[in-house]
Amino acid sequence: MMRTHYCGSLTEAQIDQTVTLCGWVHRRRDHGGVIFLDMRDRDGLVQVVIDPDTPEAFATADKARSEYVLKITGRVRRRYEGTENPNMVSGQIEVLGKEIEVLAASETPPFPLNDDTINVSEEHRLKYRFLDIRRPEMLERLRFRSKVTNLIRNYLDDHGFLDVETPILTRATPEGARDYLVPSRVQNGSFYALPQSPQLFKQLLMVGGIDRYYQIAKCFRDEDLRADRQPEFTQIDIETSFLNDDDIMDLMEGMTVKLFNDLLGVKFEKFRRMPYSEAMRDYASDKPDLRIPLKLVDVADLMQEVEFKVFAGPAKDPKGRIAALRVPGAGSLTRSQIDEYTKFVGIYGAKGLAYIKVNEIEKGIEGLQSPIVKFIEPIVMQLLERVGAENGDIVFFGADKAKIVNDAMGALRVKIGHDLNLATCEWAPLWVVDFPMFEETDDGKWTSVHHPFTLPKSSVEDVKSNPGEALSVAYDMVLNGTEVGGGSLRIYTLEMQKAIFEALGISDEEAEEKFSFLLNALRYGAPPHGGLAFGLDRLVMLMTGATSIRDVIAFPKTKTAECPLTQAPAPVEANQLRDLGIRLREQQKKEA
């Protein structure tokens, strides 16, 4: 072997031992004829000292520069008193270098790798990702990710799950986002689709008797990107037979508790289980951040008789909502701050942001500061009583279609909570349960809230007669306002699956064309089954404190789904397209 130890693993236990290290020059310093090299590998740093008593080694060290790859042999010794570095594992020792070999020289990197902070664009970092990964922060995140997947595998193995791979080349099925399509050369004119999830295959594995399945699965979705989205992402995919929803949630909660305890030293209590209706009512979100102790209060019933159309209209609209958000002690917010919050809710479609500052509530109307009080004077004190307002508070109001109010006020609640440092704890996990089975589109059609294979709590007859009232046996794990996992029990009878397709407007012919393999499987004794999928990238992002999942993926894509490193996606040769029976429109125009 080329080395005996990793740089970052050396401690006082190796004092007086001769060691051989391989790594990169993190920093080089020349102090009065003695050269100091901070050597770095994936485990960390160690200081190497080279003095003129070893002229060959000294000459080599004198030529070495940042990011040179060196092999160094030397003796471990204790650092002189006063030169210890308590911030390093190896901070009590150093290596007196005797032999140095340059394994590879390096050009000057396009950005420094030895600074704690990096002032360079993300795209530039991604273009040189092989260098960016060398930074200790990136190395630690990827190491942490490996620990997460290893612990998950061990947990699931210990609970009887089998690691089974499912196909990457499959067929397009309606799962909500656009598919990435792969043309077939052999079956000209036909296309594979890269899987958005292994959903149907894992259900078929349950029909096949696998009983407990898991997979660290690559998934692909051609959709608009955000901080927590990538065109290709990794899913911890899980499915079980003969367990109910409580069993599955308990099992997955146990895995999450172990993850946080073993890797972060964080101890979770029993996860709260919150119905979807409560989450939307109190937090205007199906993934509420419970660290923030602010709740919305419905006040539409009080607004129905006011003459102020901004409130009266939504109050009388069956699809409208008026929600109040009381922020204790925030009455000192300035007009410019309120204007910024007004702009913020505008991002979500809100037309404005009404507010009341409560200065001296005992004075009634005179003790309030607001441009809307004069329009709602008859009910304003009732409003304040309902929300529990006290002196020094401010109360914000959202009034519009329910979706706009929920999006705007839910986001405002979180933003104000962070801006004013209102969070009461570091971690707040919960399960959101009892989701609606369907939601109505603008054109009056039904669409699945999760996916069309989710088991409803309703009977077949109720699904057919009143789909809007159906709830699903679905559950999402939410952590700090982020959905880290979602799952459900699945439909396992042909009759129910056909009823769901019918409610969604999928004809028998279309169902047979797209899902014949699933429908056929349901004819041969499918067990009751269900599962869950965790977003690995998102989970690791939260656990490491990263601001984007791109910071916990080795080679991510940009927000425009491009790879600056490899220049993917890229044009291909004309003969490759001919083999696939494809001609680009641009080519056709040029040839014409």
Swiss-Prot record:
Region (Aspartate): 199-202
Coiled-coil segments: none
UniProt xrefs under CDD domains: AspRS_core, EcAspRS_like_N
KW Transferase (keyword) present: no
GO cellular component term of the entry, any: cytoplasm
Residues binding L-aspartate: E175, R221, H450, R490
Pfam family, one: tRNA_anti-codon
Residue numbers marked as site, Important for tRNA non-discrimination: H31, G82
Location of the protein in the cell: Cytoplasm
Positions that bind ATP: R221, D222, E223, Q230, E483, G535, L536, D537, R538
GO biological process: aspartyl-tRNA aminoacylation
Name of the protein: Aspartate--tRNA(Asp/Asn) ligase
